[in-house]
Amino acid sequence: MKEMNRREFLTLSGAAVVALSLAGCGGGSYAPPAPAAPTGKEAKVLEAINKYREPLPPLTLDSGLDPAMKIVVKIAKGEMKYDKKAVEALGNAIVDYNEVGAPIGIVFDHDTGYMMPVYVYSEDVEKMAQNLLNAEDVNLKSPAITLVNIQTFEYNGTTFWVALVAKSKK
């Protein structure tokens, strides 16, 4: 057996301690932290959407759709026309997701070529859920949808909300 000097011994024993400590704390099975719970207006809209979806499982708020949502809000506010360029930008923003639905809360105005916001934000969750029932949004009723991104914004003195839904991340 080879004799070790002090430096080799300390190096080897230090490596062994690190290996044992990692094994003891389950270093190989790291679970990422749960996503932060939504707060504020987006939380109320999410609650209304999940009421509308009952008895389907609740949707999970996903911040990865933020870049696409910024484009949707610009379109809803009339700051960006819904054209080939907008469609391309949205396509690039949702590339990491499977089956992203059409934006919820805006409709196309055939006269102007712009999208218009339709869902007014309310502190009353029941009213927002009722508005969804009146609109019968097919995207939200799909059991395959699991993720949502919600944005509220001011337009002409009124607070509106829009949402994007997706089946999953790729």
Q: What residue ranges belong to the model's regions?
A:
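Residue-level marker of positions within ordered structural domains that often coincide
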Residues: G14, K74, Y155
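N-terminal secretory signal peptides and thylakoid transit peptides that target proteins
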Residues: M1-A23
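Bacterial signal peptide processing site
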Residues: G26-G28
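Short, well-ordered surface patches within globular domains
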Residues: P32-V100
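Generic low-polarity alpha-helical segments
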Residues: F9-L10, R53, M128
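A well-ordered secondary-structure block
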Residues: G91-K170
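Short coil/turn linker and secondary-structure boundary residues
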Residues: M4, G40, Y82, V120-E123
